């Protein structure tokens, strides 16, 4: 999901 990608990138 988009949230996982966002926090995973950080």
Curated annotation (Swiss-Prot):
Intracellular or extracellular location(s): Secreted
Coiled-coil annotated spans: none
Subcellular location, principal: secreted
Domain of life (superkingdom): Eukaryota
GO cellular component: extracellular region
Keyword hit for Transferase: no
Tissues expressing the protein: Expressed in the abdominal ventral nerve cord (at protein level).
GO biological process, one term: neuropeptide signaling pathway
Modified residues (Arginine amide): 10
Name of the protein: Tachykinin-related peptide 4
Keywords: Amidation, Neuropeptide, Secreted
């Amino acid at each position: 999901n988009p949230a996982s990608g966002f926090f995973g990138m950080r």
